[in-house]
């Protein structure tokens, strides 16, 4: 069964088209108009071994908020659709990932119950053209539109670029772990019988 999903979403602020293959090889085709954000999404694709096409046109003349938040909303919806009924998958994923001086923990549960928790604070307002406060908005949007419980903890770090890159890569590894099939799981991994 292919775990591929595509979604297009057009508003007055953004025009977004995303395709995600959970069982890919890490190929990214990303264009959001925000260079650092493109770099992070390419890292997510590569380190999660997801094939990701993400074409975004946003009102960057205003700022980067709508572009980044709306991309998170659509990516979360695509993740949810690609995961499907969740039968046979691990459901949980955790990664502690180093990125130079930064050490980030990401843990998630594809429970269907959205929740976002993070203790991450940045010392700079921007990395390239991306506002660092948008990192929270992006992952919050993913957690709610995908229906996942998502936690980040920054165990060490001082360079905002390294910290953000560590978050995107750790999220990719944790999501890859959570969506991995386990032959011992014959149904949905829940005492309720559904997620």
Predicted regions and their residues:
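N-terminal intrinsically disordered, cationic/polar leader segments
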Residues: 1-195
């Amino acid at each position: 069964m292919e775990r591929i999903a595509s979604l297009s979403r057009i508003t007055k602020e953004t025009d977004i088209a995303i395709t995600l293959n959970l069982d890919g090889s890490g190929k990214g085709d990303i264009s959001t108009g925000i260079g650092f954000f493109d770099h992070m999404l390419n890292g997510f694709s590569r380190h999660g071994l997801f094939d990701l096409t993400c074409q975004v046109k946003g009102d960057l003349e205003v700022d980067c908020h709508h572009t980044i938040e709306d991309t998170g909303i659509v990516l979360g919806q695509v993740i949810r659709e690609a995961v499907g009924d969740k039968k046979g998958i691990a459901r949980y994923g955790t990664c502690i990932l180093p990125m130079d001086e930064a050490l980030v923990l990401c843990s998630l549960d594809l429970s269907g119950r959205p929740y976002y928790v993070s203790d991450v604070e940045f010392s700079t307002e921007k990395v390239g053209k991306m506002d660092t406060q948008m990192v929270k908005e992006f992952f919050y949007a993913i957690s709610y539109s995908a229906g996942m419980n998502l936690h980040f903890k920054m165990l060490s770090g001082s360079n905002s670029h390294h910290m953000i890159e560590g978050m995107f890569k750790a999220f990719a590894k944790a999501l890859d772990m959570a969506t991995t099939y386990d032959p011992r799981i014959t149904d949905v991994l829940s005492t309720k019988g559904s997620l």
